[in-house]
């Protein structure tokens, strides 16, 4: 009996919660698609670094589970609210509360099963698209077919059970505490209004604004090249985020009353068209769902940050490769074994050119003082002739120095230590004063020297008599290198790279060897992982926000139908009525997005202080922010349009 009733009710209510069903189905489809890709042997074989994809996905899925739990729990509450009188009537007819609880649970499980049944074929199709994106990001000219596997299906079922067990336990707990009266009047309840005193509300609103501004200033103060790499920066950023969260919730709990107060004080605006009705409707809703608005703003903020971070990560790909491995093969070791390295490489590759260069010690460490001198007590020096040979191999402009000049090559992250630094405008080498001609960051790479974050380029005659610190070998091959070459070098030269000290401890010095092909593969894999996972997170979060607002609005279209029927009886035609509804929904959807968009823009502008040194363009982030904002509004507007259509349908049905 209960089963038939649950099936009938589920079939009847699917139309009202179609948006919710679509979002849950899409969420499970994405989870299943990414699990299929992560557990695919074909994807893992593409790149050794793709093993990290599975571990990263597991961590992301934990976040997604909480978001879907929040979504389903919130929607279940509204489904329960809409049918509370019906359930209360069942109790009046003598049906036990326990049986009513089972009825509601069965209905929710049926909806969930429908979602997961639809999710498997949709997720399978979507996994082919995800694999295509990953293959393109990896730059591999082939198409992969992702096959179904029981591990991914099993994980999907585990996630499904975890989510629904948590949601349904919470629902059963709520039902167990309710009486017949609670059931009959449950649809009259809302979130409690947090502030009834206008003075207290105004103080909270102003303090929240101030706290938000302070948090963003704190965030900006740490996002500089000077501070970003300091150990305490993470603590400051966490404090800033906590303050921002408090600020967003504070603004969300007070903005509705502030909005209404401003409107009521402006008589011209107050009585213009439908402004008063829209403002009153929004305020009555926002006052009772202020905490929800805060949560939705946080979800939008996270989604925008995820979209922008994935874009910046993709843009920094070429720069990261050149920063770690600008040459086909680069290594530093004893000169005596360079020929052995060359023989290993020649077994499979044709060598076009080799460059040997030395790093020398300048004992006065006049520049090192500004680059954390506690690590080394000398300045690493490179001969001008060697530097020009390196530049020539990379097809970069050559450098010329007079006898009284020197040059600095450093990481872009530390350019601020050199720029406008009067203390290093002149240094003394071999009892002669040398003036700083300039500095360069484009020709720098991380293993140009192992003894610092910069090198001093001197005319050749000044390195005579200086102690040699390191011996480096650069190899240019005719063919493009790959990760297998790096593995081969490390395996064949293990006797040189892996050493045992006097205490019997093994020291693996494989970091001495860098192969460009391996670095390209690793960076492409990292870009593929970051871009796909962060887009996945953003889509789920935006969909969750859109669904909650849609369900909330559609519930109101039924709950407060008398408002719109009254407007019709007062002579408002359908065109004007639907315009009012559009305006009402537009405000409802925009309010949680405004603060999130502003905060995300300020935070990305601050992070750009760091990333512009890497990207080489201080305005590039604006283009990415604009494009990602378009993506956000495209997804968000789909929910707004669907909500508007459903709202109109409910109003017309009631009429």
Feature locations, PLM:
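Feature of multi-pass inner-membrane transport and sensor proteins
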Residues: 1-18, 82-86, 96, 131-152, ...
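Selective transmembrane-helix segments that form parts of the transport pathway or gating/packing helices
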Residues: 14-20, 104-122, 161, 196-205, ...
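Peri-transmembrane interface segments
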Residues: 15-21, 33-63, 78-81, 89, ...
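Small-residue-rich transmembrane alpha-helices
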Residues: 28-40, 74-78, 111-140, 152-177, ...
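Alpha-helical transmembrane segments
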Residues: 29-59, 133, 218, 222-225, ...
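Long, hydrophobic alpha-helical segments
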Residues: 59-74, 543-546
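Nucleotide-cofactor and metal-assisted catalytic machinery
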Residues: 320-528
């Amino acid at each position: 009996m209960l089963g038939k009733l649950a099936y009938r009710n589920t079939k009847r209510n699917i139309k009202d919660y179609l948006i919710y069903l679509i979002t849950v189905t899409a969420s499970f489809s994405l989870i299943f698609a990414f699990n299929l890709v992560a557990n695919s042997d074909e994807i893992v074989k593409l790149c050794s670094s793709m093993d990290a994809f599975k571990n990263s996905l597991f961590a992301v899925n934990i976040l997604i589970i909480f978001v879907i739990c929040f979504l389903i729990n919130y929607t279940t509450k509204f489904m329960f609210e809409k049918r509370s009188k019906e359930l209360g009537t069942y109790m009046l007819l003598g049906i036990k509360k326990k049986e009513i609880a089972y009825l509601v649970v069965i209905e929710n499980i049926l909806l969930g099963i429908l979602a997961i049944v639809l999710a498997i074929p949709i997720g399978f199709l979507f996994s082919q698209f995800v694999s295509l994106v990953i293959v393109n990001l990896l730059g591999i000219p082939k198409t992969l077919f992702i096959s179904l596997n029981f591990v991914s299906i099993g994980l999907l079922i585990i996630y499904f059970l975890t989510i629904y067990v948590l949601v349904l336990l919470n629902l059963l707990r709520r039902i167990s505490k309710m009486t017949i009266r609670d059931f009959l009047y449950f649809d009259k309840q809302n979130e409690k209004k947090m502030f009834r005193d206008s003075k207290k509300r105004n103080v909270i609103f102003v303090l929240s604004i101030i706290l938000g501004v302070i948090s963003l200033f704190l965030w900006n103060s740490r996002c500089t090249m000077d501070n970003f790499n300091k150990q305490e920066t993470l603590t400051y950023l966490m404090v800033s985020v906590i303050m921002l969260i408090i600020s967003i919730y504070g603004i969300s709990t007070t903005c509705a009353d502030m909005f209404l107060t401003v409107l009521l004080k402006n008589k011209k605006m107050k009585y213009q068209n439908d402004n008063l009705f829209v403002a009153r409707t929004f305020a009555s809703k926002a006052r009772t769902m202020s905490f929800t608005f805060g949560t939705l703003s946080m979800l939008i903020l996270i989604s925008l940050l995820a979209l922008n971070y994935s874009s910046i990560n993709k843009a920094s790909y070429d720069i990261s490769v050149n920063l770690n491995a600008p040459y086909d093969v680069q290594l530093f070791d004893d000169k005596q074994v360079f020929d052995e390295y060359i023989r290993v490489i020649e077994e499979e590759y044709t060598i076009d050119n080799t460059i040997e260069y030395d790093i020398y010690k300048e004992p006065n460490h006049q520049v090192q003082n500004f680059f954390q001198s506690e690590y080394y007590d000398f300045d690493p020096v490179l001969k001008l002739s060697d530097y020009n040979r390196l530049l020539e191999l990379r097809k970069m402009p050559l450098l010329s120095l007079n006898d009284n000049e020197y040059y600095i090559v450093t990481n872009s992250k530390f350019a601020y230590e050199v720029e406008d630094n009067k203390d290093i405008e002149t240094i003394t080498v071999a009892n002669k004063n040398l003036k700083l001609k300039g500095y360069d960051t484009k020709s720098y790479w991380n293993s140009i020297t192992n003894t610092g974050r910069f090198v001093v380029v001197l005319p050749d005659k000044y390195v005579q008599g200086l102690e040699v610190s390191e011996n480096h070998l650069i190899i240019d091959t005719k063919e493009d290198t790959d990760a297998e070459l790096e593995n081969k070098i490390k395996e064949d030269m293990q006797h040189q790279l892996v050493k045992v000290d006097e205490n019997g401890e093994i020291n693996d010095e494989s970091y001495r060897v860098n192969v460009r092909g391996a670095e390209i593969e690793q960076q492409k894999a990292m870009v593929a992982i970051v871009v796909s996972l962060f887009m996945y997170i953003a889509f789920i979060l935006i969909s969750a926000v859109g669904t909650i607002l849609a369900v909330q609005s559609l519930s109101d279209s039924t709950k407060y139908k008398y408002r719109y029927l009254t407007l019709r009886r007062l002579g408002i035609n359908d065109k004007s009525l639907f315009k009012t509804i559009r305006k009402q929904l537009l405000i409802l959807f925009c309010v949680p997005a405004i603060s999130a968009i502003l905060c995300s823009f300020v935070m990305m502008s601050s992070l750009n202080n760091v990333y512009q040194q890497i990207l080489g363009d201080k305005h590039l982030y604006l283009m990415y922010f604009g494009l990602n904002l378009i993506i956000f509004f495209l997804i968000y507007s789909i929910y707004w349009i669907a909500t508007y259509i459903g709202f109109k349908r409910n109003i017309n049905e009631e009429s």
